[in-house]
Amino acid sequence: MGDYEKYIVKPFDWAERPLIHHDREVMNGLGPLMAFLNTDMVADADLNIFIHHIDVKTPPGPEYVDVHAHDVSQAYVFPLPGIRFEVTLGDEEHVVDSPATVFIPPRLRHTVKIIEGSGIEVSIVRNEKYEQSLAEDAGG
């Protein structure tokens, strides 16, 4: 193995692992959540990248993410057309059709709900471990 081969990793199904502020049972009902990068995969990683394959069979989709904030920035990326979602940023609610990206600055309270459609959601959170990124008491 070369010096840098350790930086090439394969995703794995997050399956039944917990994810703070997320209802995993409901998420699993929408489709699998795959971990593409975290410190379990690459010890030096300072990003957590998840891809959620989503298929809302009966609109509107269920709520599965509690309002929360991180001490670091986050981005939700919906790269393909086919999903309508609602994102709450602070006290503002926005309904958005994919493709779209939502940048969430550090400490901004937020949540996301998939209203209808099918496709993928990419979540990118800065920090070594997702749990370490959560803000205790964030305004906004």
What spans do the regions from the language model cover?
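Conserved metal-binding segment of the jelly-roll/cupin
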Residues: V96-G117
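A short beta-strand-loop-beta hairpin characteristic of the jelly-roll/cupin
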Residues: V72-S98, A135-D137
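A short, N-terminal "cap"/entry segment at the start of jelly-roll beta-barrel domains
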Residues: M1-G61, V65
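Ordered hydrophobic segments in well-structured contexts
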Residues: A35, N48-H53, Q74-F78, T101-F103, ...
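Short histidine-centered beta-strand/loop micro-motifs
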Residues: G61-D71, V87, K113-I114
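Short, surface-exposed beta-strand/loop "edge" segments at domain boundaries and coil↔beta transitions
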Residues: T58-P59, V95, Y130-L134
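Double-stranded beta-helix
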Residues: M1-P18, I115-G140
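Short acidic (Asp/Glu) patches
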Residues: G61-P62, L89, P105-L108
